């Protein structure tokens, strides 16, 4: 009964929007190689955490974009009498990569386990309910699940600008400044995801056709993953302050 509104998956083919999926695959792969190169020679374990997490983010995203571009990560869902193309691998990507992005931010801010668990719990709930929205077979149900997912996003952003930002203010000024830049980037980009969803084919409004919807998600993904990682890992001196937050008195 609870899953009655979910449509069974059907085979689907990738259309002309595949160009954006291949660009996403290449972009994420290049980002991964860049981060691996930046991480060579880093010996401090705390600094290595940032490199490892960020490399996994773009590696997972590259694999999921490849899955979508080659037609594996796509299905069709019947909504009324219309077949919608749904890239389910996008949700698999987000399910793994967005918690890792939040973990990067949390480590930078020096958050405790409760704050990290709250952020990741809200994030997984947000992505899960978003996936249910995408796979639902009635327009009203899709919008309802989108609203629930968006509510989880707002709650997550509330914790991000509240508790996590308070933690960051207790760090060294340059660490707090870097956190602020990355936090603002995440807020701006993540807020656009539900907007693109509701305006695109998945939101059933169809103001954005699938071709441009796919392009928009690709640009957001590259900015939120590769762009985020570039800003974070270029600030090696700041990461050194995170690794050694206090200096021994001389």
Curated annotation (Swiss-Prot):
> Where is this protein found?
Cell membrane
Q: Which residues carry this modification: N6-(retinylidene)lysine?
A: 225
Tell me which GO cellular component terms the UniProt record holds.
plasma membrane
User: What InterPro entries does the entry give?
Assistant: Arc/bac/fun_rhodopsins (IPR001425), Rhodopsin_retinal_BS (IPR018229)
Asked whether the keyword Hydrolase is assigned, the reply is no
For the site labelled Primary proton acceptor, the residues are: 93
Q: Where are the transmembrane segments?
A: 19-37, 52-70, 87-104, 116-135, 143-162, 181-199, 213-232
Q: Which GO terms fall under biological process for this protein? A: phototransduction; proton transmembrane transport
What Gene Ontology molecular-function terms does this entry list? Answer: monoatomic ion channel activity; photoreceptor activity
Q: Which residues lie on this side of the membrane: Cytoplasmic?
A: 38-51, 105-115, 163-180, 233-250
What keywords is this UniProt entry annotated with?
Cell membrane, Chromophore, Hydrogen ion transport, Ion transport, Membrane, Photoreceptor protein, Receptor, Retinal protein, Sensory transduction, Transmembrane, Transmembrane helix, Transport
Q: How does it sit in the membrane?
A: Multi-pass membrane protein
Disulphide bond pairs: none
Pfam annotation, one family: Bac_rhodopsin
Extracellular topology: which positions? 1-18, 71-86, 136-142, 200-212
Biological function: Light-driven proton pump.
Q: Which PANTHER family match?
A: BACTERIORHODOPSIN _OPSIN, NOPA (EUROFUNG) (PTHR28286:SF2), PTHR28286
Give the family this protein belongs to, as stated in its UniProt record. Belongs to the archaeal/bacterial/fungal opsin family.
* Name of this protein: Bacteriorhodopsin
Lineage in the entry?
Answer: Archaea, Methanobacteriati, Methanobacteriota, Stenosarchaea group, Halobacteria
